[in-house]
């Protein structure tokens, strides 16, 4: 049984959360898997593919693509701000700062732990994109899950940090689709008559 170096943390963290953290953090430890987890955990490594994905949507789908790019940018900005704000309000220390025998630590940030911004941002992105284009659901949600898993595997977040981030991100992504994407697309419909009926029909179908 592992014990925390921080005497007061047992009043904050449940035994289940700590046990789940150690199970994920200590299983499947290998040099190759560690490198893979570090690779997908670097923000730039999933930021640029996301940008490329949105640019492709913009190029192929014209107005729908532009509406999706704008709505996604707004939604992810909101999720990132919310995550950073909650970190400061809740002020939960990262496991790599307060627990002993933590494996795989690459960079233990001085920022707080709850929630995981990696999780909240990646699930916001995955949800708003897949609401508009359901064919991308599998790859985007698998990617988001791997990113969240990597944060626990690398010892910088508890499972509940990632789970809460994922739930918040999914909610923000859904709200972003409903209140930003569809509203922006409706605005384009009124402002730009070149928006085709085919695009609008696709949008209505994907919304049901």
Model regions: which residues?
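N-terminal transmembrane-helix/juxtamembrane module of multi-pass inner/ER membrane proteins
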Residues: 1-49, 82-111, 191-208
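Membrane-helix interface segments
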Residues: 32, 63-68, 132-139
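Alpha-helical transmembrane segments
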Residues: 43-46, 69-72, 135-142
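Interfacial segments of alpha-helical transmembrane regions
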Residues: 51-82
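Small-polar-interrupted transmembrane alpha-helices in polytopic inner-membrane proteins
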Residues: 73-87, 138-151
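Alpha-helical membrane-inserting segments
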Residues: 78, 82, 86, 90, ...
């Amino acid at each position: 049984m592992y014990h925390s170096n921080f005497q007061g943390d047992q009043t904050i963290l449940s035994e289940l959360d700590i046990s789940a953290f150690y199970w994920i953090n200590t299983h499947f430890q290998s040099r190759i898997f560690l490198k893979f987890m570090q690779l997908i955990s670097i923000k730039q490594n999933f930021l640029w593919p996301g940008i490329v994905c949105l640019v492709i949507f913009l190029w192929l789908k014209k107005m729908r693509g532009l509406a999706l790019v704008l709505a996604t940018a707004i939604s992810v900005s909101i999720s990132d701000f919310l995550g950073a704000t909650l970190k400061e309000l809740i002020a939960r220390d990262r496991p790599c700062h307060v627990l002993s025998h933590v494996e795989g630590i690459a960079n233990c940030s001085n920022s707080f732990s709850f929630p995981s911004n990696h999780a909240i941002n990646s699930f916001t992105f995955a949800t708003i994109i897949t609401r508009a284009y359901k064919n991308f659901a599998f790859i985007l949600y698998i990617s988001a899950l791997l990113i969240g898993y990597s944060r626990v595997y690398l010892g910088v977040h508890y499972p509940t940090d990632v789970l809460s981030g994922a739930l918040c991100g999914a909610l923000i992504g859904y709200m972003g689709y409903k209140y930003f994407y569809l509203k922006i697309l409706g605005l384009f419909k009124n402002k730009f008559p070149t928006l085709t009926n085919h695009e609008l029909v696709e949008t209505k179908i994907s919304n049901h």
